[in-house]
Structures are given as C-alpha cells and as structure tokens.
Amino acid sequence: MADVRFEDVDALHRKITKSGSPYAANRTVALLSKMFSLAIRWHMRETNPVKGIERNKEYHRRRYLSGDELVRLTKALAKHPDKEAADAIRLLLLTGARRGEILAMRWEDVENGVWSKSPSSTKQKEHHQVPLSAPALQLLEDVRKRQRPRAPFVFPSHGATGHLVEIKRSWAQLCKAAGIEGLRIHDLRHSYASQLVSGGASLPLIGALLGHSNPLTTSRYAHHFNDPLKAATEKVGAVIAAAGKPAKPVLKLKRRGRP
C-alpha cells in the first residue's frame, strides 16, 4: 500500500483501457482513489497516487424501448418459461423501478395501492413511497394467487437472500426471442421515464416517481420535452401571428328576392 506510485496506477489504467474496457479502467481508478483516501485517513500513507490520473472520456448511453420493441417484448414475455422472471420484468416496465428494488419487493411493502420501498432496497438508502398503477396491482394480484406456498417476497427463491437476485439470463433470452439488440434491463427505467414525459409529467414529478434525490439526475430526460414544447410554442406562435394579420373581410350574401 505504501509503495504504490502514481506511475503504477497510471500504467494499470492504461492497461485496462487498451484491453478494450475504458469505462472499467475509470471505475478501477475511482475505487483505488477511495482506498488510498482511507489509507491517508488511517495514517498508512501521506499522498493519494491516483491524484492527477486522466480518466477516459465517457459518453452517457441513452437507449429507450421503442413502441415496436415493446410489442415484441410483451409477446416474448407471454411465452417465456420462467414466469417469475417474466413477471419481474413486467413490473420493471410498469413501475420504472430499479431491478434490485423489484426483486427484493415484499408483500408487506404494498398497501392500499402504494409501494413503500425499504431503505435496504433503494439506491439512496432511504424510504421511497410510490403509487402503483392498476395494471401493476393486477399483476401483483395474479402473482400472489399463483404463489404456493406463500412467501414474504413477491419473487422468492431458495438462496441466502430469500428472493431472486438475478434475471440476466432470462433477459438475454427474451431479447433474443423479441429480436431486440443493445437494450439493458436498466434501460426499461429510462423508457418508463420517457413515457412519463410523453404523458405530460414534469421533471419534479418524474424524479419523485423514480426516487431521485438529486434533480440533476432527472434532468437527463429534459430533452424528451422537445416535442411537447414544440407543440406548445407552435400554438402560441399561431395566436400571435393571427393577431398581427388584418381581419379578413366578411362577405355579405345578397338576399334573393322572393319569386
């Protein structure tokens, strides 16, 4: 720990980058920076060798589920043999929740149509309450009727956690069956947000539904407002333009004489 130099960290970052994983290289450096910061606090060394390492430029990936892809995915979900995984993905589509939140959902967390997420399952480690739509509640009712024996978790398993922890395999199978490429499970959350925008929801409302503690996180969806904003400004423009034009003369119809 005490012998690690800037050159060592820089060489590691370059090596991982050259292997074709520039983002992983950045994550590694970030982890090392945290480790050495703790080492300084614990008086194990005086400097952080990560300081000054130039990170690789990252491009924020934006991928959303198209209308056609949604239809194909829905059909694939109906035929998928793993009903629990399929239902978990349906809930992801209907709630915009994170994968970990859905998989750790407890029956006791849902009451009167509201899902109260426990701090242990949320990214912010805080309570988050969100109302569930009628289709989401119907799906949960169907899952509960099918669940035998009853379990505390909506998606139980025999593992250490007591609930499903991974659905990557099912997701890969579903994407292949639906002919969908380049779509991650987390992209369903982005797709949910884009649908909220299309429905006229404001950024603060979207942030509240998604459980964002930082408004800047929600601002990534601001570009989706371009279409409704364009429509709104066109309406105003039409009114202003019409006000500046002279009124069209009203043609008086000649009254025909009686025969």
Place the predicted regions along the sequence by residue.
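Basic, Lys/Arg- and aromatic-enriched nucleic-acid-binding interface segment
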Residues: S19-L31, R41-A104, T122-H127, Q147-R150, ...
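A Lys/Arg-rich helix-loop hairpin that forms a DNA/phosphate-binding surface
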Residues: M1-H13, E58, R62, I185-H186
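Short basic/aromatic active-site micro-motif
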Residues: V4, A85, E181-G200
